[in-house]
Curated annotation (Swiss-Prot):
UniProt lineage: Eukaryota, Metazoa, Chordata, Craniata, Vertebrata
Assigned protein family: Belongs to the dwarfin/SMAD family.
Domain MH1: 12-136
Subcellular location: Cytoplasm; Nucleus
Alphabetized InterPro entries for the sequence: Dwarfin, MAD_homology1_Dwarfin-type, MAD_homology_MH1, SMAD-like_dom_sf, SMAD_dom_Dwarfin-type, SMAD_FHA_dom_sf, SMAD_MH1_sf
Region of interest called Disordered, as start-end residue ranges on this chain: 161-240
Subunit annotation: Found in a complex with SMAD4 and YY1. Interacts with HGS, NANOG and ZCCHC12. Upon C-terminus phosphorylation: forms trimers with another SMAD1 and the co-SMAD SMAD4. Interacts with PEBP2-alpha subunit, CREB-binding protein (CBP), p300, SMURF1, SMURF2, USP15 and HOXC8. Associates with ZNF423 or ZNF521 in response to BMP2 leading to activate transcription of BMP target genes. Interacts with SKOR1. Interacts (via MH2 domain) with LEMD3. Binding to LEMD3 results in at least a partial reduction of receptor-mediated phosphorylation.
The species this protein was found in: Coturnix japonica
Name of the protein: Mothers against decapentaplegic homolog 1
Statement: the UniProt record of this protein carries the keyword Phosphoprotein: yes
Amino acid sequence: MNVTSLFSFTSPAVKRLLGWKQGDEEEKWAEKAVDALVKKLKKKKGAMEELEKALSCPGQPSNCVTIPRSLDGRLQVSHRKGLPHVIYCRVWRWPDLQSHHELKPLECCEFPFGSKQKEVCINPYHYKRVESPVLPPVLVPRHSEYNPQHSLLAQFRNLGQNEPHMPHNATFPDSFQQPNSHPFPHSPNSSYPNSPGSSSSTYPHSPASSDPGSPFQMPADTPPPAYLPPEDQMTHDTSQPMDTNMMAPGIHPDIHRGDVQAVAYEEPKHWCSIVYYELNNRVGEAFHASSTSILVDGFTDPSNNKNRFCLGLLSNVNRNSTIENTRRHIGKGVHLYYVGGEVYAECLSDSSIFVQSRNCNYHHGFHPTTVCKIPSGCSLKIFNNQEFAQLLAQSVNHGFETVYELTKMCTLRMSFVKGWGAEYHRQDVTSTPCWIEIHLHGPLQWLDKVLTQMGSPHNPISSVS
């Protein structure tokens, strides 16, 4: 018997509860997590029995099992801090759980974590895992009734001319608190609210994670309702804030099935690829994300961890002192995670990150090119597959060019430490010292298949279009 085992003792209650532990969750850490919980529950009459009942009879109704909420909402176990409901769901149900965004409370739960009550329920059977929504296929007309006289190319040119020389800026959470009047027309029968910006946005104070696999973030908004295609109304394109009076006549959705080709969404092997730039120079190879939880940081990791894109490893002979200084401040960088058809960005760096996402801007009613500042410790949803699916379904009725325009929505740009836009002396992202471009493979491949079915544009795309 070694010295460690002489001084270690696991109580019978902890041993019993560990009997229901799932998968390969780190043994010692799980034991400490359960031990910490037992100490809290022993102070409450019947709490231990209720937890054991829930774990032993998962199909049966059970009551809330609560512990006091800490000041920051997190629970420290050994050297790691995490959200309590996520920790115990990870121990007893889903060892591969990545973040709180993957959990939703059941209706029977009286003390869900998101309710911010003095007590928080840690009963793992009072939470369910968020599943990726099934996106409806896009119905592409076989015979387009789109009138080439109503070319949208001129409107695209006008839109580009009317856009500000520099993007607008917004700071999270300040610019996100008040509902924004939505500049994009919505389908009359859309299941989305009239003002997406009025929904509760992500909580502003999300503590930084220790690693991409740790469940240590504060909650964000829940996924929006599934898109219900309109049955008898004309849909309007919402991909850009164009003059709807000039829109080409759409194709009525209520058309014969034989006249359309259904194009379904397919989840790709790599949900995104990330390319790193310094000023206008691409540096290194693209990083292909197979894990749904990715860290992009300024450190070096020679182990080639598939969950980390370490910018500290990349060299550039043209690097100047400004770039060198900026790279030193990237630090823990950004945590990107893809869950339930949504992409979130959490700033782990001590310095802010700056994101340009047309999908996020659409949701909040901002100008398409707005750059959003995400301060340290904050988390923001930067892409929503369901909203993209709605826009794509509407856009096919307005022709090839409108659908093609959505490719801009599938590329996200993000700079570290230094921002750009109207409030900064850097006008363009290529003027920032360190930035990344994120290509979302699923939406891009879906667009590609839809465009293939639509054939060629009425006006050939050229260098001036």
